[in-house]
Design a protein with these regions (language model features):
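Conserved beta-strand/loop positions that form the S-adenosyl-L-methionine
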Residues: 45, 68
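A short glycine-rich, Lys/Arg-flanked "PGG" loop and its adjoining helix->strand segment in the class I
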Residues: 131-145
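Conserved beta-strand signature within the Rossmann-like core of class I S-adenosyl-L-methionine
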Residues: 146-153
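Class I S-adenosyl-L-methionine
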Residues: 164, 169-226
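Conserved glycine-rich SAM-binding loop
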Residues: 48
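S-adenosyl-L-methionine
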Residues: 1-43, 51-58, 80-106
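Conserved SAM/SAH-binding beta-strand->alpha-helix loop
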Residues: 71
């Protein structure tokens, strides 16, 4: 479903301009200058309206968080939420995952968040999934040694497929669950996650830690899980 066009988008974004990075490529290798002394640099791919972004920043104020979002109408809401909360450790980038190596230097990112991404359910769309091997290889270029991907989704088929895909590209899985909130709310939730939890929908989650890996000549292209 397409998001309704926000009124006064440009002036609203300008009003939150202090947290908007207009030229992320110029900061490649220098992101930590935005917050000297930051414990970690984390990147959220697809921040949406920013509930997870703002709540994570509030819970861990010593972490530099870069929120990447390619839908300006969603990002402006996230920017306003962060600005109104007075959070100084969050910055926003209008972009997508394919540009990560152009925006970040090798080893610059400690953690990536992928929350409720588009599942791209058709088999001929699999290369667009953010857990596809092509993207995983990009993440390897920018993650620090032992860096992590924290992945959550409500889509059971995407999760099952991802659990097979991710280890093939030099990531070790841990904290795997198909019902994160079985015994009650766990951790910081996104807007989607709150909605799904209230409806009793299970949430899938895993952590993928980068380990040494050599790319094979021709990685196997697997069919979708049934």
């Amino acid at each position: 479903m397409r998001m309704r066009k926000k009124k006064n988008l440009v002036p609203r974004m300008e009003a939150c301009g202090s947290c908007l990075i207009r030229d992320p490529f110029a900061l490649r290798g220098r992101w930590r200058t935005l917050m000297p002394g930051a414990r970690e640099l984390r990147v959220e791919l697809g921040c949406g309206k920013g509930r997870f972004t703002a709540d994570t920043a509030a819970a861990e104020p010593d972490v530099l968080l870069i929120a990447v979002e390619k839908v300006p109408d969603a990002m402006v809401v996230a920017m306003e939420r962060v600005t109104e909360a007075g959070l100084r450790s969050v910055f926003f980038v209008d972009g997508d995952a394919a540009l990560l190596p152009d925006m970040f230097a090798p080893g610059e990112i400690d953690r990536l968040y992928i929350n409720f991404c588009d599942p791209w359910p058709k088999s001929n769309q699999k290369k667009r999934r953010l857990t596809h091997g092509n993207f995983l290889k990009l993440y390897r270029q920018v993650l620090a040694e032992g860096g992590q991907i924290h992945f959550k989704t409500d889509n059971d088929k995407l999760f099952a497929w991802s659990l097979e895909e991710i280890p093939q590209f030099g990531f070790q899985l841990s904290e795997v669950t198909t019902d994160l909130h079985r015994d009650g709310p766990v951790g910081v939730m996104t807007d989607y996650e709150r909605k799904f939890f209230s409806e009793g929908k299970n949430i899938n989650r895993c952590v993928a830690s980068m380990v040494p890996w050599e790319e094979p000549a021709e990685p196997e292209d697997r069919p979708d899980a049934e």
